[in-house]
Amino acid sequence: MTSNDVRDILSLPERPASQPSSSAQASGSSSRNRKSSGSNNPHPSSAASASRPKPKYDGMTRELFALLGDNAPSLAMTHGLDAEGKPVMGLGGLFKPKFKRRKEKVRQWRWTPFLNSARDDTQIDDDVPEINHGLILHHWAPARSFSTTAADGISAEDADIDTKYQYAAFNTTSGVYSYSNDEYIQHLRDDDWTKEETDYLMELCTAYDLRFVVIHDRYDWAAAQASFLAGSTSAVPQPVKERSMEDLKVRYYAICRRLIRSRISTDDVETRQMLLSTYAFDKQREVERKKAVARLYTRTPEQLAEEEALYVEIRRIEQNEAKYASEREELLRLLGGWESLPSSSPHAVAAAGSGIASLLGAEEDSTAKGRAGSANKKRKLQQIEDNGTPGADDAGSSTGATAAATSRPSANLTSKQRAELRQAQFDEMQCIVRFASNANATTDASAGGIAGPAAVSAASSSTRPPYAYLVGTASTLPAVTSNPANPTSGHGVYLRSSRMLAPRPNLVLRTTQVLSESDPPVGPRLIFPTAKNVEKWENLIGAVTTGLEMRKQLERVNAELRIAKQRIAAALHPNRMADKSEASAEAVESRSAAPTENSIAATTSTHAQITIKTE
């Protein structure tokens, strides 16, 4: 407890700042001694830090602020910010101030009359208040606005009437069109409408602010015509026609469009067209819309349930759209035929499904011919530069067969071609297949180069039919894709029988069963896996799996077709389908309840045969 606490408890006045206490003097002298004795200490003591004066914050008691201890105050307390981050003077702004009564006198409100200048039946003149008249309304208003004294000749009651209504400026109208007699005669004549009835319609539109529901309810041309004939002696009565709301709208909007077209305006063409479009009205469409709404509100519970079922079915179809699309593509690929496809690319599959595979094949043939012609020209120029013998053109135009290559004279072949020929003959004798890059193999095969079976097989790999239901690597494709950046890279030696196409796991059993049921039966494995045998085996497995999938798709489509026919028949003949279902149920019950004589005889003969065999 410090001296300040004691003074606070005893309610003593605070010590003046010029007269420090003895304890403070003693503490000051001791602190000075410690400072002089320990001037070389780089870390000041905690007592020295505690003796530092702390800033005083207004708006918070000393005890509450002492709870902070040695902790630093928050930024809001330091900078004097309130709870919303607004700067205030001192710490008192952190707390909600107490309620302070305003020193001004409370305003008085009076129930006072006023005139609305926006009304047509109200006339207001500030210069001559005596002639002000109209519907007097009342509202609550401050009394100070009516503290003026009454003028001479004006009663106190009239002086209290407020003539400046603050909400009169917000009164707006729809801008109903008006016309003159000349405009009506020149542009607005109609055989179905008289001028008097048209004027009556425009008056109602102005009175009810184009609210056609109210206008149609208040429309009574028979009574209006009677009053008009009573006031005029030369008018001839006309037959009164029944007018619907659509008839009133058609007449009003037609008048507006004709007036817009006939009147001179400074607006451009686009503005006038937009203005005309705002007054467009289609009577037939409006009638059909109202009929549709009436039918919508008169639906039965059965129709509502059917509509809900249709909505659920549509949502289900939308959710399964991706699945149906994939099944459709698969079915088109099956119907298009896998044998007619030149390659397994997505474009070729789509072309086969849409029936344009022939066009795609023609384009590929023309492209291949163009590549072959350019390759022949390059090879001819290269041979002329090497040997100066243009006779090598015959070798470049060959089909690439080995027998044709051996029949050529060796004088027309270069050293590179002779080496390729010897290598091709050796590979053919030893049944060796060498895979080259796809680009080089395709170019050499199309150009007729002598690369042997390797080039032929590599080139034919791009024209192999796709096997949609086989997995693995085809025998005509390398096990590892060659890298064009590194032509010398390749794969190791492997057995051809270890890399063959196989059916999918879900088709293995059915494929094996179909092969065993064939004539002659075919085993599940290939005995002599040569290159030709492997290729034929893959063709056979691909045909079997494709046929199985096609049969599965056919059964599914037939089942869906049968269900659709049953639904159509049930929708067209509901009573007949109910009779058939009842008849079939009765037949099943009769067969299960009472066996026929034939079944009893058959059962008896069966028992007799079993008895004879056992004896």
UniProtKB/Swiss-Prot annotation:
The keyword Transferase does not apply. It is found in: Nucleus. Keywords: Activator, Chromatin regulator, DNA damage, DNA repair, Nucleus, Transcription, Transcription regulation. Residues 595-615 have a biased composition (Polar residues). One of its GO terms (cellular component) is NuA4 histone acetyltransferase complex. Residues 16-52, 391-407, 584-594 have a biased composition (Low complexity). InterPro entries: DAMP1_SANT-like, Swc4/Dmap1. The keyword Disulfide bond does not apply. GO terms for molecular function: transcription corepressor activity. GO terms for biological process: chromatin remodeling; DNA repair; negative regulation of transcription by RNA polymerase II. Residues 1-56, 367-418, 575-615 are annotated as: Disordered. It comes from the Eukaryota. Component of the SWR1 chromatin-remodeling complex and of the NuA4 histone acetyltransferase complex. Belongs to the SWC4 family. This is SWR1-complex protein 4. It comes from Mycosarcoma maydis. The gene is SWC4.
